[in-house]
Amino acid sequence: MFRSVSLSSLIPFLIIVSIAMQRPENDVPMIMQSSWLVNEVIKSINSNGQYINALIKKDFQPTVLPVSFILRILKFTATTDSKDITAVLADSTHKIFAIFLFFPAIVDFENKYHHRMTYNTRSCLIRIHKANLKFMDKSTVKKCYGRKSDGGLAIAVLEVLEFDIFFKDQYSFINSIENRLKYVYDDVEYNQLCGKKKHKPEYEDLMCDI
């Protein structure tokens, strides 16, 4: 059974979906989402100039009310040798790489919903209850997400520990709309901040099966 959602809980971040052709060219039709991801990632990284390990922020979450930690699953990209699942998630304007840990995130999810995490969840909205933000080594980023190294750019990844389905319907849009979603890594401020990092955190090198 999926969790029921009251109308009052949707109002703060509800954006009505309509036919793409009826929207202005730069208006991306998203539901129940806000644009907050890139600002929170940059804020978290900027709060500490040096890192002795890969962890950027424990218990990463939106800090501006009434934004809720709701993201859309765009795609699953790989499974690691530890049975973690890598994916791309998005708010209303930006995308980020994510990794769902097998334990506790995937185990708890599959025990709750009685089906595999990847079953009919692509393009669904999820509410993340607990997650960390951490840097991932470039070789793992290439293996698990297919992104080539951008020089010295450090890649921040969302490590999901606890989540559930927020809205079970699957929402995807034509390519011209989906392509308007930008990676947080392509943001100018992110590049200025993470492209010149002098720290060398210890990374965990993961093996991924595409």
Swiss-Prot record:
Subcellular location: Nucleus; Chromosome, Telomere
Transmembrane domains' residue ranges: none
Annotated GO CC locations: chromosome, telomeric region; telomerase holoenzyme complex
InterPro entries recorded: TPP1/Est3 (IPR019437)
Alphabetical GO biological process terms: telomere formation via telomerase; telomere maintenance via telomerase
Principal location listed in the UniProt entry: nucleus
Keywords: Chromosome, Nucleus, Telomere
Keyword Nucleus annotated: yes
Family classification: Belongs to the EST3 family.
Name of this protein: Telomere replication protein EST3
This protein's encoding gene: EST3
